[in-house]
Amino acid sequence: MRTKQVPVLWACFLLWSLYIASSQTVYPGITARITQRALDYGLQVGMKVLEQLAKEIVIPDLNGSESLKFLKIDYVKYNFSNIKINAFSFPNTSLAFVPGVGIRALSNHGTANISTNWSVKAPLFRDSGAANLFLSGIYFTGIVAFTRNDFGYPALELQDCHVQVSHARVSFFGSLSALYNSFAEPMEKPILKNLNEMVQLCPIAISQVEQFNVNISALEVLTKIDNYTVLDCSLISPPEITENHLDFNLKGAFYPLESLVDPPFTPAPFHLPESRDSMLYIGISEYFFKSASFAHYVSGALGTTLSTREISNYFSQNVQGFGSVLSKIAEIYVLSQPFILQMMATGPPMVNLQRNNFSLEFPAAVIMLTQLDNSTIQPIVSMDFVASTSVGLAILGQKLICSLSLNRFRLSLPENSQRDAKVVRFENILSSILHFGVLPLANTKLQQGFPLPNPYNISFINSDIEVLEGYLLVSSDLAYDTSSKPQPNLNSWGDLNLVHRPWREQPTH
């Protein structure tokens, strides 16, 4: 009887494990989507970059020996040196998504014009000169597969790579060029054979893919945002690839700088719309902003202490006519005694993303204190308040521009405190400080903008931001600066302030 129960127990355990695993699904904080339009533009730019690189490629000498039976010569040693690609064309080239795998590159009917120096040596003669080699019917295919490694980095692998040159035509130049050109056609077959054996495009491509993996792994997935927080942008799953797009699902979570502990909430699922009008779509979930709010709160970043002089001097320099109002605050409360204003968050700012509405609600406490003649600090009044603001967003050039507007301001006294005339006046003054002082100054700072990253000199153009239910949607086209020299590494990310520390395993929820 006990033996029969064992399979049943194992089955129950398996079902329970599957249930637990399904309930721990991790959703992204950020999803970046690349569309077919981006591939088409990337192909267009890539061909221009290849034209620049082709002129700098060092091609090894091509040499060998062949028997020329039509001339009754047993063997001729030949050497082609100083080989340079002058021009090439790949009119039938395409990039397409391969669902569940990656991106396929396909090119056929390509041509290339190559100049070279040549020399031949036979038992009865030797000669040298210049020549042009025209290649046609160039065929290339390969798939770049996208995966994710154990540390949250994207990883690439080149699969099914094949290169074939179908035709080669040689034109010789020199004193005996007419003679050589008369029997160039029989020489083209062995040249084509050796050329196909020596074409190293696939190994070169594999080497570049491997170098990309090395470079991307050298970057830290944690980026230091400020003195309080870091941002984790590691991949949480392999890239998702359909016939129409490629999605990168990123962690998109903020952490306190000194403690990589997940916040006490998890991201909710969201889905990007099936639109193909832009090259790039980025979905930034509510979780991204909530984790930023939580990380700054637990790091102690959301608090400040200001003296009468600091407040008056600061606002008199930045807000016309406002400093004179603040200079009278001491008279209102404590006559000629200076005061100290302490403001601190009592919880993480609450983030709410609804369609066409991005709002932040700041719960905080404000304490006004005065310093007596004997240096004793005496509290005047203590209040809790909640300020609700709306957030406006726009992308201008290469910067993300933000602005805040105050929706409502609510003060509340502790239950055992009395609400007298001084408190009412303090409410009015504090509300005025927020309306006419804090928010305008914050907006002045915010409107300087946050620079958007442009790796490999890729910029955002025709950008738009839309607030949807539970996430922000950024749509943009891309532009590549073709005037800059292509870089073989990721130096364009070098200005990011990266945290150099070992990465931990992906958290589970």
From Swiss-Prot:
Keyword field: Disulfide bond, Glycoprotein, Immunity, Innate immunity, Secreted, Signal
Q: List the disulfide bonds.
A: 161-202
Report whether Ribosomal protein shows up as a keyword of the record: no
Query: PROSITE patterns from the entry?
Result: LBP_BPI_CETP (PS00400)
Would I find tRNA processing among this entry's keywords? no
Q: Where in the cell is it found?
A: Secreted
Q: Name one GO biological process term.
A: innate immune response
Check the UniProt entry and state the signal peptide residues, or none: 1-23
The organism sits in which domain of life?
A: Eukaryota
Q: What is this protein called?
A: BPI fold-containing family C protein
Organism, as annotated: Mus musculus
